């Protein structure tokens, strides 16, 4: 039995080493592709949160979203376009794959997460956009993984790491757990934060631009109690 255990342990170690190698980005390929993806936009270094818009914006809208949620799918382009028109507001993504949409929802969340790790902030948001464009929603998923322009050589790595990379898996699980701790169990849900006052407000569903502006005005005008 001891010899068998040693053999099995050795096989497992080799498998983990191969997986780790597969999930490591190719530095030379990344450098060659630097100017082929999002040439006209600025890449933002990943620091634990994916943020769309100005990093210096006073207000942050944290969107708790599921990539298989049909309501999130419809709302995402509207919210993104609204942020484009309001430079003092940025958008932060928070993964919340719902149990009813598993296992596809978590896989897609990991896929977008790893795409962002591979090539940065802009590619993460592009991955989210592509998934929403292609998914049949409600757990049905996409007909094949999205293809990100300029990342063809890394596609296999992204697909594999979305399935098996433990760090990416933990990121998605941790964000979903944090949402549950905060009492957020439905998507989409927004939490708007004011960096100046430190206050925040939660909005459930898909509020339109007028509601978003009203919430921001309330945060900006509320006095200390």
Located regions from the model:
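A short beta-strand-turn-helix
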Residues: 42-59, 83-84
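Conserved strand-loop elements at the edges of beta-sheets that form or border functional pockets
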Residues: 54, 63, 205
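Catalytic His-Asp charge-relay segment
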Residues: 60-62, 189-190
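Structural alpha/beta surface segment adjacent to cysteine/selenocysteine redox centers
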Residues: 62-67, 73-150, 182-185
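Short, flexible loop segments at the rims of nucleotide/cofactor-binding pockets, characterized by
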Residues: 39-40, 70, 167-168
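C-terminal cap of thioredoxin/glutaredoxin-like
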Residues: 1-23, 147-225
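Ser/Thr/Pro/Gly-rich low-complexity linker/stalk segments immediately outside membranes or between
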Residues: 25-42
């Amino acid at each position: 039995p001891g010899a068998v255990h040693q053999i099995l342990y050795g096989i497992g170690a080799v498998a983990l080493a191969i997986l780790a190698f597969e999930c490591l980005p190719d530095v030379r390929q990344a450098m060659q592709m630097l100017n082929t993806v999002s040439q006209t936009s600025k890449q933002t270094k990943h620091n634990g949160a994916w943020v769309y818009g100005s990093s210096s914006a006073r207000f942050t809208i944290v969107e708790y979203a599921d990539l298989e949620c049909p309501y999130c799918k419809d709302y995402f382009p509207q919210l993104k376009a609204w942020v484009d028109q309001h430079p003092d507001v940025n958008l932060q993504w928070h993964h919340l794959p719902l149990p009813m949409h598993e296992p596809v929802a978590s896989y897609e969340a990991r896929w977008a997460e790893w795409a962002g790790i591979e090539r940065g902030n802009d590619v993460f948001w592009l991955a989210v956009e592509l998934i929403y464009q292609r998914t049949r929603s409600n757990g049905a998923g996409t007909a094949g993984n999205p293809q990100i322009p300029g990342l063809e050589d890394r596609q296999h790595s992204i697909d594999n790491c979305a399935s098996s990379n433990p760090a990416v898996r933990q990121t998605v699980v941790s964000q979903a757990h944090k949402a549950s701790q905060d009492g957020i169990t439905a998507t989409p849900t927004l939490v708007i934060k004011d960096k100046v006052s430190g206050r925040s407000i939660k909005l459930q569903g898909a509020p339109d631009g007028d509601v978003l502006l009203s919430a921001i005005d309330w945060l900006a005008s509320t006095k200390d109690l």
